[in-house]
């Protein structure tokens, strides 16, 4: 969860003191007191699809994962509720120096300072109430760094599934494409339809260096309140 990235208490206070935005979708029926902000899946993150539990794997396979990975992707991450359950990147892409990992692992590795420097600098907790909430309770998400001059010719993809009724999903995607580099990143989100309110309040921050190119595509199929 949102550890090691600034003053969580301060962001929570900002959330408590701000009014609900008067723009965007209707949030009638959403009672934040009833939203569970963290739901841990019944597995740790795996690097092999065969090791993902069958019930979770079945959900993603109906949506074309990992078939898409085998055919046309440089790497795939799959998040189930609040944490990633699968993450893998092609060896030839990793050998180019491309970093594609989950946010928690990025915070523990050699790119931790880079994550801290860029986290919630484009989307600030003071932007609106749900940005502050995201900063306080975020979990999961992807970190991507493409070094100078590196061109990733096939896309990377992260997929987020919110499956628990009454839950919120607060993944954070942070992509840094350095000078002269090139990347296409695809992100997908989905959730089943429930008769209770769910909340999706993820955050995406994209940093593109001089003469670099980033194409970011998002595909969503959400039957819930999306901020």
Where are these regions (language model features)?
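Glycine-rich and polybasic anion-binding loops at the starts of cofactor/ligand-binding domains
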Residues: 3-225
């Amino acid at each position: 969860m949102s550890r090691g990235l600034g003053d969580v208490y301060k962001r929570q206070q900002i959330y408590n003191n701000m009014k609900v935005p008067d723009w965007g979708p209707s949030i009638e029926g959403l009672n934040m007191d009833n939203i569970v902000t963290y739901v841990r899946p019944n597995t740790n993150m795996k690097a092999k699809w065969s090791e993902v539990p069958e019930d979770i794997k079945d959900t993603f396979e109906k949506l074309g994962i990992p078939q898409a990975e085998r055919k046309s992707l440089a790497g795939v991450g799959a998040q189930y509720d609040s944490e990633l359950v699968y993450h893998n990147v092609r060896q030839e892409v990793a050998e180019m120096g491309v970093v594609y990992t989950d946010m928690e692992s990025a915070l523990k590795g050699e790119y931790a300072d880079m994550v801290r420097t860029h986290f919630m600098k484009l989307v600030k907790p003071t932007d609106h109430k749900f940005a502050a909430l995201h900063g306080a309770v975020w979990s999961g998400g992807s970190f991507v760094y493409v070094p100078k001059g590196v061109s990733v010719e096939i896309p990377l993809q992260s997929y987020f599934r919110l499956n628990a009724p009454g839950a919120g999903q607060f993944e954070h995607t942070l992509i840094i494409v350095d000078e002269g580099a090139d990347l296409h990143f695809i992100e997908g989100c989905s959730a089943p339809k429930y008769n209770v309110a769910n909340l999706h309040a993820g955050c995406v921050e994209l940093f593109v260096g001089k003469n670099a190119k980033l194409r970011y595509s998002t595909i969503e199929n959400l039957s819930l309140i999306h901020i």
